[in-house]
């Protein structure tokens, strides 16, 4: 059984036991979160596709960690004008393990 869920503006195809990295969620480490924006659910018999979400479906996940990704360097310059700007960015994320898919 797998599900397609949306969180943080992205879509993820998950099964029970999968570990995924999503955009930062407001949750404590070792707590559980319910993701209710389930776009599709598939089991052995077939697939249910929502319009836009599957009614009554939810994915339960446990928060493993909160952290920041590797630094991305943003470097702007203008040729021949002695203009240089170096900036870094680290995007926060939440690491989840999928515990249960309910449809």
UniProtKB/Swiss-Prot annotation:
Gene Ontology biological process terms in this record: translation
**Family annotation (Pfam families):** Ribosomal_L21p
InterPro entries reported for this sequence = bL21-like, bL21-like_sf, Ribosomal_bL21, Ribosomal_bL21_CS
Entry-linked PROSITE patterns: RIBOSOMAL_L21 (PS01169)
Gene Ontology CC terms, in alphabetical order:
cytoplasm; ribonucleoprotein complex; ribosome
Q: Which UniProt keywords apply?
A: Ribonucleoprotein, Ribosomal protein, RNA-binding, rRNA-binding
Q: Which GO terms describe its molecular function?
A: rRNA binding; structural constituent of ribosome
Question: In which domain of life is the source organism classified?
Answer: Bacteria
Instruction: Name the family.
Output: Belongs to the bacterial ribosomal protein bL21 family.
| Quaternary context | Part of the 50S ribosomal subunit. Contacts protein L20.
For this entry, the protein name equals Large ribosomal subunit protein bL21
Protein species of origin: Clostridium botulinum (strain Alaska E43 / Type E3)
